[in-house]
């Protein structure tokens, strides 16, 4: 995945432009779970807001799995002053509303990621600049590209286990970081 990110970097540099997300302070990282991200590290990087994906990042698409320790991690981050915003491309509006209310996080649905409009709207509602916001999601083609286009840093988490869609069977290994097969959700961390 880092190789694909560097290809986009090289492409923009060949055009003589540098996308806003490639500034010194911005970064791209891959982790297994949401809870494995250190809140203190984000704060040291100047992060004050998190744009969070819902489907297969926080909750599996079929609602069977919740990211291990995800709710606790969000509550801890909120107590430390970090703002959250959910952007979801999911088709089930009531599901997005349910999780938005349960986690007490505002949401935009449908976000039409990777287009940057919803990312900019979320940043405006949090009253933060792109260098103060990080995008956390599981999909390269929506979350990582959306972060790149909107000028934000990004952390890609492993996709929670879910029934694969037809296109994921064909392209999944290029757009998602798979959840480790040798690990169970409750064994992580």
Where do the language-model regions lie?
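Asp-based, Mg2+/Mn2+-dependent phosphohydrolase catalytic module
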Residues: 2-52, 59-64, 68-87, 91-135, ...
């Amino acid at each position: 995945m880092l190789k694909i990110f560097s290809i986009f970097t090289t492409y923009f540099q060949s055009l003589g432009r540098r996308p806003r997300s490639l500034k010194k302070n911005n970064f791209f990282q891959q982790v297994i779970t949401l809870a494995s991200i250190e809140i203190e590290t984000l704060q040291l990087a100047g992060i004050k807001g998190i744009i969070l994906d819902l489907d297969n990042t926080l909750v599996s698409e079929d609602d069977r799995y919740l990211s291990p320790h995800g709710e606790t991690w969000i509550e801890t981050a909120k107590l430390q002053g970090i703002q959250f915003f959910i952007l979801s491309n999911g088709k089930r509006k009531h599901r997005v509303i349910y999780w938005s209310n349960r986690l007490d996080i505002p949401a935009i649905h449908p976000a039409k990621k990777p287009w940057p409009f919803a990312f900019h709207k979320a940043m405006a509602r949090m009253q933060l600049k792109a260098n103060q916001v990080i995008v956390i999601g599981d999909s390269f083609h929506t979350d990582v590209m959306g972060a790149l286009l909107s000028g934000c840093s990004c952390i890609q988490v492993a996709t929670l286990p879910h029934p694969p869609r037809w296109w994921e069977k064909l392209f999944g290994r290029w757009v998602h970081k798979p959840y480790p097969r040798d690990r169970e959700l409750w064994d992580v961390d």
